[in-house]
Structures are given as structure tokens and as C-alpha cells.
């Protein structure tokens, strides 16, 4: 069975976010549709409707998990599920019907949904990968050069696929950028897989030409966005010195539980997360 890697990013503005994160969610092909269906049902369960119906576009993690969400969620005691769903649904249907209770219910529903989505992904055997870049990291100047965060992410994908018994093929699924940015990324990815020794090796298991999709129509790219945002603001590996948001601790734990980890017979440990302090290609 093949694996699809749904990829999204967080913190690319290099302003407010403490880290720039490129995250990938790997799902076995036969698990994709059941996971999507259950996530759709979960949105109905927590909000009384699909989030796309509510917002008319992708519900980004920045909207679901920002500080305001947690502040509003905590301004009252936990609301019983049925009442919480009803109140959240009422506010999503008509944003002018603002009450303290509805705002609280919507905040609590957003957090509960994100936690449920991450745990659901794990129950379907999904694993996550991420490259984590400080805002101050030097960046490449040549447009044709693939940044290190992409190269390291592909490396982690390859390790994962190569260690599976059937050595399945992997497909790259990116959130669609503007057309010119897509062409630039396609060229960079092609150069990596065709012109570098590591890339040619990894092309044995990773299809070198990625697919681009609209994230507001692709549920699992949205889930990768939740992973990327949570890592940027909530996960802290040993070398990550920026402060985290304490209210994201539970979600950070859910993301860490999804991280790819493998111990080789040699004792070497392979992991899905990598902190990169310099994005310029080697040499």
C-alpha cells in the first residue's frame, strides 16, 4: 500500500510565529477516505456543520487555536457537549448573535475538535514529520536551490518508507500556492530528485513530482496545518529556546505522540522532527 504525505506550513511570515514549520502527515492510502469521512463527521459533531460551510474557506489553525480561542473557552466552566454544539452552531450560522455563552462554546468546540482530530489520525496509523526553523535562520538566495527544510523533510519521508516491510511508494501533496510559487517549488523539487545523489536515491520510494491541492477542499492538508501550528507555538524540542504557549501543552502532547520514531538494529534512532538553523544548501 502506498503512502500519501500531506504537507503544509506555519510561520512563513517570519513575524509573529516563533518558528517556521514545514509539516507532513503520512497516511496509508486505504486509510485516507475513512479518516476524511470521520473528520467530516467530527466537525458536524462539534460544530453542528462543516467548517467550510461556516467560513467559506479553510479553517486555519491560526483561527482555531489562537490565544483568543483559549481566552474565550476559559471564561466559563466547561459546557455540556449537546449545549456546546448548539451554541457554537448558532454563532457560526449568524455571527451577529454574539453572547458570552456562545463565544465560550465555540472556543471550547474548536479546541476539542483539534484534539479529537489529532487522536483520530493516530488511530488510523498516521504519523507526522516536521522541519522546524528559527526566524533568524539564514536563507538561500538562489531560486533554483531547494531549501534544507524541504530536503530534510524528504529525507525523513524516505527513512519512514524504507523501513516499512513492503517499502511502499510515497506521494507528495502540497497546499497550492499562487501559480508562480508552485512552478518555482516544482523546479526546486525536480532539481533535488534529479540532480543530487541523495535525491536520486530517495526517488526510488518518493514520486518526485508533487500534487498541489486547494487546502480548503482537502481535509488532511488542513490537519497538517494544525500539526505545523501546534509545533511552532507549543512543541519544544531540546534545542528550541523560544517560549511556548502553555495552553497548547495538551495539543503538543498529541502531536508528539504522532511523531515518526524508529530504533534501528544498530541502535540508531530515526525521528520525524528536525530543527534546522541554516536553510542554505550545503556547499
Label each residue range with its predicted role:
Residues 1-283:
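Phosphate-ester processing/binding pockets and catalytic centers
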